């Protein structure tokens, strides 16, 4: 059974200004904590579309949400398919959309999934167990240059080249098959002094591999741009991010749509086409409370950004 503590649960949903008969999308169902909190505020005319690319999460969520199943439509898909999902459901616009971009605790804690650098498992890291690309494929078959690129770009790992060289040397002897085997190789590529600070030495490379396997940043960028077009006027979008790459991307997209296109000089009245599409509800991201941190240490890096649609 999934046991997952949702980060900033109240804030994420409360900032949506939930209407009891509204239609909402949970883009990252996970352990269904946010979904349950939202569903408790909807009447029987309200509806939640719950998306997850992990079928196991959906199966478990059905148990968590068993008292509200008549109000939920479950969709096994990637949230980058948002427009198509709504089209298939004959829904044009919704009242609010929210994202929790953290890996759910069960995915981290079930060793077989291969997300954790604390447990030994095969190198997998797929959110969607039906897709082909795995961490094993990347680690053993991608070029040295490609490894350096993803470790640096997605993990912000300053020892990317050294780690990629060690991986290259090891896989020439035999395939690298398990998470703890990879952890030992990563440690070889990081100077002893640097290993003693900044958290677990494998943290950044594992993050980079997870993002690459699941194409996370590209999928989120595709999805959030669709979300902005799919939410009704006065509706809101809430996004919880867990690392600087996601947060920066979310901030940039919201800023871009808040600014709107550049207005030609000399116009007596600004046409609607040049007015902002949205406004940021909070200029600075909301961070986890002490209470959140007591419940869930993973909340330490969480940031919540909210936007309201204007047209």
Curated annotation (Swiss-Prot):
Catalytic activity: cytidine(1402) in 16S rRNA + S-adenosyl-L-methionine = N(4)-methylcytidine(1402) in 16S rRNA + S-adenosyl-L-homocysteine + H(+)
GO BP of this protein: rRNA base methylation
SUPFAM superfamilies: Putative methyltransferase TM0872, insert domain, S-adenosyl-L-methionine-dependent methyltransferases
Entry EC number(s): 2.1.1.199
Keywords from the UniProt entry: Cytoplasm, Methyltransferase, rRNA processing, S-adenosyl-L-methionine, Transferase
Pfam families attached to this UniProt entry: Methyltransf_5 (PF01795)
One GO molecular-function entry: rRNA (cytosine-N4-)-methyltransferase activity
UniProt-annotated binding residues for S-adenosyl-L-methionine: 32-34, 52, 79, 100, 107
Top EC class, one word: transferase
NCBIfam families reported for this sequence: 16S rRNA (cytosine(1402)-N(4))-methyltransferase RsmH (TIGR00006)
Protein name (Swiss-Prot/TrEMBL): Ribosomal RNA small subunit methyltransferase H
Organism placement in taxonomy: Bacteria, Bacillati, Bacillota, Bacilli, Bacillales
Gene: rsmH
């Amino acid at each position: 059974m999934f046991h997952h503590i949702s980060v900033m649960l109240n804030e994420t949903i409360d900032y949506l200004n939930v209407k009891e008969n509204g239609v909402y999308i949970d883009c990252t169902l996970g352990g269904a904590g946010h979904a349950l909190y939202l569903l408790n505020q909807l009447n029987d005319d309200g509806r939640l579309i719950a998306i997850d690319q992990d079928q196991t999460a959906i199966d478990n969520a059905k148990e968590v949400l068993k008292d509200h199943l008549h109000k939920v439509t479950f969709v096994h898909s990637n949230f980058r398919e948002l427009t198509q999902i709504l089209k298939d459901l004959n829904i044009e616009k919704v009242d609010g959309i929210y994202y929790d971009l953290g890996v759910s605790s069960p995915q981290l804690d079930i060793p077989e999934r291969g997300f954790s650098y604390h447990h030994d498992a095969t190198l997998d890291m797929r959110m969607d167990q039906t897709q082909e690309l795995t961490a094993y494929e990347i680690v053993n078959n991608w070029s040295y240059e490609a490894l350096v690129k993803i470790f640096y770009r997605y993990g912000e790992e300053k020892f990317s080249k050294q780690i990629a060289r060690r991986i290259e040397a090891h896989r020439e002897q035999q395939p690298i098959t398990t998470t703890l085997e990879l952890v030992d190789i990563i440690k070889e590529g990081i100077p002893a002094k640097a290993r003693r600070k900044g958290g677990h030495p494998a943290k950044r490379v594992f993050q980079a591999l997870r993002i690459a396997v699941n194409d996370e940043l590209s999928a989120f960028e595709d999805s959030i741009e669709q979300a902005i077009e799919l939410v009704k006027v006065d509706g809101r979008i809430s996004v919880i991010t867990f690392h600087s790459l996601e947060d920066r991307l979310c901030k940039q997209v919201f800023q871009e749509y808040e600014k709107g296109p550049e207005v030609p000089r000399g116009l007596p009245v600004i046409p609607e086409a040049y007015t902002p599409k949205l406004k940021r509800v909070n200029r600075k991201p909301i961070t986890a409370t002490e209470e959140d941190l007591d419940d869930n240490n993973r909340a330490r890096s969480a940031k919540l950004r909210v936007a309201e649609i204007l047209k």
